[in-house]
Amino acid sequence: MSKPTREEAKEAVRTLLKFIGEDPTREGLLKTPDRVVNSYTEIFSGYGKDVAEILNTKFYDTCNFQDFILLKDIKFTSFCEHHMLPFIGTVDIAYIPDNCIVGISKLARIVNAFSKRLQIQEKMTVQIAESVQENLKPLGVAVKISALHSCMSMRGVMQDNSVMNTMHYTGIFAEQQKYRYDFLNLTAKR
């Protein structure tokens, strides 16, 4: 599949405007195709991100740190691949290092890399956890995503406040309930 040109993308926006009954040549919509293409370039910039490269800078002097590292409430906005409507939420990531750690900003960067794509929350949860597991090789990883989906609030069942939670565990988090319990207790929204 070849990537359409910028002009072809702008023409597609004009077509959608006509589809909903709008006139793409009216004053307020003249620059809309260009704005939408610019927005999509930013919103979907995760396709160009290499997660392995993001997690490449590791620190090995951890002073024998053996408990888990938790970064909570990483905010994100993504777009569901089914309706192309936003879902907005937070990600909590914990890992128990084996022999290395990464700077905490790297965890937020991988959330951005995966959220700035067409997504489903379940897949994004697994992608984040498995990428940390694969690249850092920790004893285990836990990821929890909580999100509001506008495909449920703007259309269909019209549920404004329904929050979807997904979790994925690897290693010791998957094997031992105590670690899952501690993670869920620390990430519970109060």
Curated annotation (Swiss-Prot):
Q: What is one process in the GO biological process aspect for this record?
A: tetrahydrofolate biosynthetic process
* Listed pathway(s): Cofactor biosynthesis; 7,8-dihydroneopterin triphosphate biosynthesis; 7,8-dihydroneopterin triphosphate from GTP: step 1/1
- Record keyword Translocase present: no
A Gene Ontology molecular function term for this protein is: GTP binding
Specify the superkingdom.
Bacteria
Per its record, the protein catalyses: GTP + H2O = 7,8-dihydroneopterin 3'-triphosphate + formate + H(+)
Name the Gene3D superfamilies for this protein.
Answer: 1.10.286.10, 3.30.1130.10
Under the heading SUPFAM superfamilies, the entry gives: Tetrahydrobiopterin biosynthesis enzymes-like
**PANTHER family attached to this UniProt entry:** GTP CYCLOHYDROLASE 1, GTP CYCLOHYDROLASE I
Self-association and partners: Toroid-shaped homodecamer, composed of two pentamers of five dimers.
Q: Which family does it belong to?
A: Belongs to the GTP cyclohydrolase I family.
- The protein's name is GTP cyclohydrolase 1
Organism of origin is Rickettsia felis (strain ATCC VR-1525 / URRWXCal2)
